[in-house]
Amino acid sequence: MPQSIGPRSSICIVRLSAIGDVCHVTAVVQAIQRQHPQSPITWIIGRLEHTLLGDLPGIEFIIFDKSKGLGAYRDVLRQLKGRAPFDVLLQMQTSFRSNLLGKILRAKRKIGLPNGYGKELHNLVVNEHVPGSEAFHVLDVYKGFAHILDVPPFDAAWSIPISENDQRRARELVNHNQTYLLLAPSASNSERIWNPENYAALADYAHSKGMTVVVTGSPAQRDIDLARQICELADNAIVNVAGKTSLKELLALCRQARVVVGPDSGTLHMATTQQTPVIGLYAHSNPFRTGPYHGLSYVANSYADIMASRGLQKQMKQWGYRLKGAELMREIKLETVTSLLDRVLSSTEKRPSVSMN
């Protein structure tokens, strides 16, 4: 049951990573801010994720730098030294690292995910749980943290600052092209990467529709190599910005794009925060749980067919169930994705503009 909190109750968020998840959490945190504008909010977050969200207004961020090992915990405790316990701690991550952090933080109420959703000793850290519900998408489950603090039902919305410098840099990277498809081909798990030949063919198809194609990626060598391979395979020129952007510049690229295409990755969820159409490529996880929020109608979903072919229909409703196998992405056909692109381009719908301030 929702419980009212005082008008100045202090709230701590524990969600360290990853990019997609912190994008989901941002919508929840900003809903809490709207309902409880006088409640101070502290968010303990990873170093990389902080570069994307660290300028969100009205939130105190404390960086948890996992590269420091135990020193990361000491750094957090040092910054909180002398403070009263938080009134509420929202334990929104269940990894061992984040659960250990939640355990040592002082708070009167420690609220965790619904029973059955946690792992890594999550239940030993929290003294309350978000009530179970029919919610299946990760963001909808996270909304339970807001509801338990008496926040009424809300549609997910984001207001993430993008500076004029970052917007200008993004425009320069794409040579001031106004209509472009942004390819985000990589994923944290290499099994989720679609065939480079398919990406190149998709890029050529987009060119035939009068679009510029931009390929992005992190500075990791694997991403650099993948982007270069796609560019070499394509018959038409692709603007390659892999390894050349900060997360804020990438966010600006997502905002300015006509459409973003890629597998389950942080970039797709960043694009969702900017209300840019997203074509998600899903074979390993259920897009109705991890897909681009507000954009599930444009998902190339082979997951359901693969699950059915393996007689795993019951597991379809199991939260967190994933398939494994490098061959699974081959089930996503180029024709499916080009058809989805046609649908996006024929639609005038782009969700209402979002604030960059």
Per-region residue spans from a language model:
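Catalytic machinery of carbohydrate-active enzymes
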Residues: 1-357
